[in-house]
């Protein structure tokens, strides 16, 4: 839930800061912006300093962006939390920023979020350092590596599902977060001691809760608690790293790739702080997004009984074959689930978990006759593109059959695009398919209440995390 007292406090602090800055320096800094004002995209900058922050936070953020696109077009300006922004809602513009001219737009995140994850994390950087990190991160997350994780992900899926049965009400999103966290731990560390894993989970959960709170570093605030938990996480990870260095053989995973990395092209091996920052960054990228997708799949299948039966039929054939031959899912089988795979793709489009990307112009950039000034934030709006009827007819309808043919280029970017596209997308798709396989072949469920409404934190999930009941079924 939104803490409006924290919002008021946060905005008040920034307004006071802005007024002080304006009276000291404002007059000297306005001339160049006024000179170029006629070139700026259309849009509204809202109130002084806070801009349209209140409008964004007081409504569905997707409605905020869609309404402004309808009013101003596919490129428009606004101001959020004191930052002037240019929003881009066309495939061509997204590709321009993320691929064609990516060197002109650097990744940008609020400093408060960098403090919680760690300033050396991969998605805060670009250039040679980013390329070096991406190579290390992708190695244990490529298809050749993750196929060996299938038995362990199956075990985690079945264990999670079994813990939900009995007819009690389950917060599906919270449970899926637990599952995706376990998969993330597996991909990073291999198998961790239970006590260490619990300490890691406890402190990570505190950081997670504070990540999307307003960054007020005062006693009792979620942000202060998150900063304290982040320090503890660093110590826990240092101890894990020390113990793993003492082992003669390291378990395969992201941490072992970091520890085994050699000096390359002027880059020294990563130090412990850099390793910790990137481990926490990967956990953040892996947990909430995958959990959100899985929660939406459960809702969409529940709301579309005929589609659910089609998915069940497809998965039952695989399940029966494996029962007869007494083995689990294989990599080849996960590549041959066309109906289920289209359900996943349509869920990624409909829910658009990653609604936009954050970039900042490193120089004045001209695009289609408009100026994007240096220092302005730039946000390609993936959700607006995914819900554009020009590319996806009847976009509010859940229709996996639309993916029987490939979408037009640059109209479907569920994992981002360019050099900063999600490096763990293959692992995410694999765990989603495995969980869905066991869900539909061994369990049934019902959503409690209407199941309507969306909450943002910041990723979109069904309101209340999708309350549901689960029961085990007898597969035949």
UniProtKB/Swiss-Prot annotation:
Its EC number is 1.14.14.137. Induction: Accumulates strongly after pollination in whole ovaries. Induced by auxin (4-Cl-IAA) treatment and abscisic acid (ABA). First transiently repressed (1 day after treatment) and later induced (2 days after treatment) by abscisic acid (ABA) and dehydration. InterPro entries: Cyt_P450, Cyt_P450_CS, Cyt_P450_E_grp-I, Cyt_P450_sf. Pfam families: p450. Heme binds at residue 422. It is an enzyme of class 1 (oxidoreductase). Signal peptide: none annotated. It is found in: Membrane. One of its GO terms (biological process) is abscisic acid catabolic process. PROSITE patterns: CYTOCHROME_P450 (PS00086). Its cofactor is heme. It comes from the Eukaryota. Pathway: Plant hormone degradation; abscisic acid degradation. The keyword Translocase does not apply. The keyword Heme applies. Expressed in ovaries (specifically in ovules and placenta), sepals, petals and pedicels. GO terms for molecular function: (+)-abscisic acid 8'-hydroxylase activity; heme binding; iron ion binding. It catalyses: 2-cis-(+)-abscisate + reduced [NADPH--hemoprotein reductase] + O2 = (+)-8'-hydroxyabscisate + oxidized [NADPH--hemoprotein reductase] + H2O + H(+). Belongs to the cytochrome P450 family. Involved in the oxidative degradation of abscisic acid, especially in pollinated ovaries. PANTHER family: ABSCISIC ACID 8'-HYDROXYLASE 4 (PTHR24286:SF376), CYTOCHROME P450 26 (PTHR24286). This is Abscisic acid 8'-hydroxylase CYP707A1. The lineage of its organism: Eukaryota, Viridiplantae, Streptophyta, Embryophyta, Tracheophyta.
């Amino acid at each position: 839930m939104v803490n409006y007292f924290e919002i008021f406090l946060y905005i008040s602090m920034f307004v006071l800061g802005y007024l002080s800055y304006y009276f000291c320096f404002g007059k000297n800094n306005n001339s160049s912006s006024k000179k170029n004002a006629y070139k700026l995209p259309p849009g509204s900058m809202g109130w002084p300093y806070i801009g349209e922050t209140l409008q964004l936070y007081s409504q569905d953020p997707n409605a905020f962006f869609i309404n402004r696109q309808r009013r101003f077009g596919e490129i428009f300006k606004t101001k959020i939390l004191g930052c002037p922004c240019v929003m881009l809602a066309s495939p061509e513009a997204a590709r321009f920023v993320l691929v064609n001219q990516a060197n002109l737009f650097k990744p940008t995140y609020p400093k408060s979020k960098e403090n919680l994850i760690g300033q050396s994390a991969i998605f805060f950087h670009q250039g040679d350092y980013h390329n070096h990190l991406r190579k290390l991160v992708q190695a244990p997350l490529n298809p050749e590596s993750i196929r060996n994780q299938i038995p362990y992900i199956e075990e985690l899926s079945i264990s999670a599902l079994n813990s939900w049965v009995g007819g009690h009400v389950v917060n599906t999103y919270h449970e899926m977060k637990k599952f995706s966290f376990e998969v993330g731990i597996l991909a990073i560390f291999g198998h961790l001691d239970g006590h260490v894993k619990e300490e890691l989970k406890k402190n990570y959960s505190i950081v997670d809760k504070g990540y999307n709170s307003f960054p007020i570093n005062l006693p009792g605030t979620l942000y202060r608690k998150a900063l304290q938990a982040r320090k503890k996480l660093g110590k826990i990870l240092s101890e894990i790293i020390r113990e793993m260095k003492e082992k003669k053989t390291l378990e395969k995973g992201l941490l072992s790739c970091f520890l085994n990395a050699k000096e390359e092209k002027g880059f020294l091996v990563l130090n412990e702080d850099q390793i910790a920052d990137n481990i926490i960054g990967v956990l953040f990228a892996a947990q909430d997004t995958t959990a959100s997708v899985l929660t939406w799949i459960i809702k969409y299948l529940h709301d579309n009984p005929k589609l659910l039966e089609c998915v069940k039929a497809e998965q039952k054939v695989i399940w029966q074959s494996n029962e007869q031959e007494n083995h689990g899912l294989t990599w080849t089988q996960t590549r041959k689930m066309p109906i289920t795979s289209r359900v996943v793709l349509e869920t990624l489009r409909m829910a658009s978990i990653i609604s936009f990307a954050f970039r900042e112009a490193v120089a004045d950039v001209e695009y289609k006759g408009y100026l994007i000034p240096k220092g302005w934030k730039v946000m390609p709006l993936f959700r607006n593109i995914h819900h554009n009827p020009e590319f996806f007819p009847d976009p509010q309808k859940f229709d996996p059959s639309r993916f029987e043919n490939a979408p037009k280029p640059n109209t479907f970017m569920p994992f981002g695009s360019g050099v900063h596209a999600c490096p763990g997308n293959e692992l995410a798709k694999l765990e989603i398919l495995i969980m869905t396989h066991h869900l539909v072949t061994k369990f049934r469920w019902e959503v409690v209440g209407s199941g309507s409404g969306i909450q943002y934190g910041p990723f979109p999930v069904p309101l209340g995390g999708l309350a549901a009941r689960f029961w085990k079924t007898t597969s035949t």
